[in-house]
A protein has these predicted regions:
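N-terminal beta-strand motif that seeds the catalytic metal site of vicinal oxygen chelate
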Residues: 1-17, 76-79, 83, 130-136
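Vicinal oxygen chelate
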Residues: 1-2, 92-136
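Residue-level marker for the onset of beta-strands and adjacent loop->beta junctions
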Residues: 7, 37-38, 77, 102, ...
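Core segments of cupin and vicinal oxygen chelate
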Residues: 12-56
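Short, charged/polar, Gly/Pro-enriched secondary-structure boundary elements
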Residues: 47-50, 59, 121-124
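Short, flexible, mixed-charge acidic loops at enzyme active sites
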Residues: 55-69
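Short, low-complexity disordered segments enriched in Ser/Pro/Gly and basic
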Residues: 72-74
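Mid-chain, well-packed structural core segment of small domains
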Residues: 80-92
Length: 136
């Protein structure tokens, strides 16, 4: 047996409105659903980015889902979104146009990455296809 893919990535933030606006308006993720003060669910290609407010999910004992979250120490997450190499400069220009600070750019082999932070300090990476041997 083998897993077929990672379906969702969960991050935690008390700034749900800012995070929703950041990912939709700056990165073009698609809105799926939200529960005011608890979560925002966004679609990123063929996977989901789930943003939870840990102040709600840590005490959410009546939910059908297990209690989860991270507040102390602040949870800083890193995740990567795959982009086409042909769109690399377009993405870089879009980030600059939206005044998003690019912390680092890397080129390793044939792969290129751009690193920046979202409003909650999570490290977001835009990485070109074929960086990892997952499509083989």
């Amino acid at each position: 047996m083998k897993f077929t893919k990672i379906v969702e990535t969960c991050i935690y933030s008390t700034k749900l409105k800012e995070m929703k606006n950041f990912y939709i308006n700056n990165l073009g993720l698609d809105f799926v659903s939200e529960e005011n003060g608890r979560h925002v669910f966004l679609k990123a290609g063929k996977s989901m980015l789930l943003i939870f407010n840990p102040e709600s999910t840590l005490k959410d004992s009546n939910s059908i889902f297990p209690v989860h979250g991270a507040i102390t120490p602040p949870s800083i997450v890193h995740f990567a979104l795959e982009i086409n190499i042909e769109d690399y400069e377009k993405w870089k220009n879009l980030l600059q146009k939206n005044q998003i600070n690019i912390e680092k750019e890397l080129k390793i082999g044939n792969s290129k990455s751009i690193y920046f932070r979202d409003p909650s300090g999570n490290v977001v990476e835009l990485i070109t296809a074929n960086a990892w041997p997952v499509d083989n």
